[in-house]
């Protein structure tokens, strides 16, 4: 396991004012030596390899042998997202993930990148709630939840558009915006959309960015072995300063349904 963590403070001085900016940056090339600053909640664990004994180098958010399994993996260090109560630092993250069905038909449900107020999983339940929320607190503005979901099961009661979509969740698993999974490529005749089946078992790369000046969230996905597509899959305007506290935690959550499906994170970078 190779991890690079950098925390630094830069002081900008002006004639009449000064501003302190705290930035946090880390990188995991893989997981599993037992010293990663990652805490597991629910059924999350270091992923098992194909032999069932050694570790795969990934984080597994669900377990094959537990029906309706769900869990979270959280970076243990709290991160400063705001210099004060109103402003919000820009941030960006990228990670490689895979969703692999082990039974047929595919029973879902998916995984999500999360920014949450606490390093625990007491509010999350399985199935379509993706270990993010539950039936009681879903939609509560006091959740202070930001998530980007990669959903592979259509739960119409939660507003899912289909069984293969990417969505932005704010305090609710009813996404404020969702689109069919895929990526854009530029051709001689213009932009061409290519579908990506999230539950194919293939490894995909996701890039999530927040521009604090324009208050824009962008989400891009693509094949893990290719470079980042030039056009985002989602680009939507949201003021996250009203959602995210000054100090928050970040990580991943996932859940499966009646069937067995493996939800894994293979590498991860974060910077604000």
UniProtKB/Swiss-Prot annotation:
Keywords, sorted A to Z: Apoplast, Glycoprotein, Lectin, Phosphoprotein, Secreted, Signal
What's the chief localization of this chain?
secreted
Please give an example of a GO cellular component term from this record: apoplast
Gene Ontology molecular function, alphabetical: carbohydrate binding
Q: Which organism is it from?
A: Arabidopsis thaliana
Q: Which residues carry this modification: Phosphoserine?
A: 241
- Mind telling me what this protein is named? Lectin-like protein At1g53070
Q: Where is the signal peptide?
A: 1-23
> Does this entry carry the keyword Phosphoprotein?
yes
For this protein, the record's PANTHER family field holds: (RAPE) HYPOTHETICAL PROTEIN, CONCANAVALIN A-LIKE LECTIN FAMILY PROTEIN
Ranges where the record places region Legume-lectin like: 24-271
Location of this chain's protein in the cell: Secreted, Extracellular space, Apoplast
Q: Which InterPro entries match?
A: ConA-like_dom_sf (IPR013320), L-lectin (IPR016363), Legume_lectin_dom (IPR001220), Leguminous_Lectin (IPR050258)
Q: Which residues are glycosylated?
A: 33, 84, 134
* Membership in a protein family: Belongs to the leguminous lectin family.
């Amino acid at each position: 396991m190779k991890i690079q963590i950098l925390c630094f403070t830069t002081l900008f001085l002006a004639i009449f004012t000064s501003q302190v900016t705290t930035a946090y940056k880390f990188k995991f090339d893989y997981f599993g030596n037992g010293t990663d600053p990652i805490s597991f909640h629910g059924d999350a664990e270091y992923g098992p390899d194909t032999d069932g004994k050694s570790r795969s180098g990934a984080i597994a958010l669900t377990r094959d042998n537990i029906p309706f399994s769900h869990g979270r993996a959280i970076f243990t260090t709290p991160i400063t997202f705001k210099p004060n109560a109103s402003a919000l630092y820009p941030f960006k993250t990228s990670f490689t993930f895979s969703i692999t069905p082990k039974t047929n038909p595919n029973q879902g449900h998916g995984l999500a990148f999360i920014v949450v107020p606490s390093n625990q999983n007491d509010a999350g339940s399985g199935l379509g709630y993706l270990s993010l929320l539950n039936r009681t607190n879903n939609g509560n503005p006091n959740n202070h939840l930001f998530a980007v979901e990669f959903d592979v099961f259509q739960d119409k009661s939660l507003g899912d558009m289909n069984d293969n979509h990417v969505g932005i969740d704010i305090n609710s698993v009813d996404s404020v915006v969702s689109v069919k999974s895929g990526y854009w490529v530029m051709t001689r005749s213009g932009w061409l959309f290519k579908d990506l089946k999230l539950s194919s078992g293939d490894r995909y790369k996701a890039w999530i960015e927040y521009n604090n000046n324009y208050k824009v969230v962008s989400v891009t996905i693509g094949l893990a072995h290719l470079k980042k597509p030039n056009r985002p899959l989602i680009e939507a305007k949201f003021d996250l300063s009203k959602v995210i506290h000054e100090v928050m935690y970040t990580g991943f959550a996932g859940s499966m349904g009646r069937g067995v499906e493996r939800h894994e994170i293979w590498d991860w970078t974060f910077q604000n």
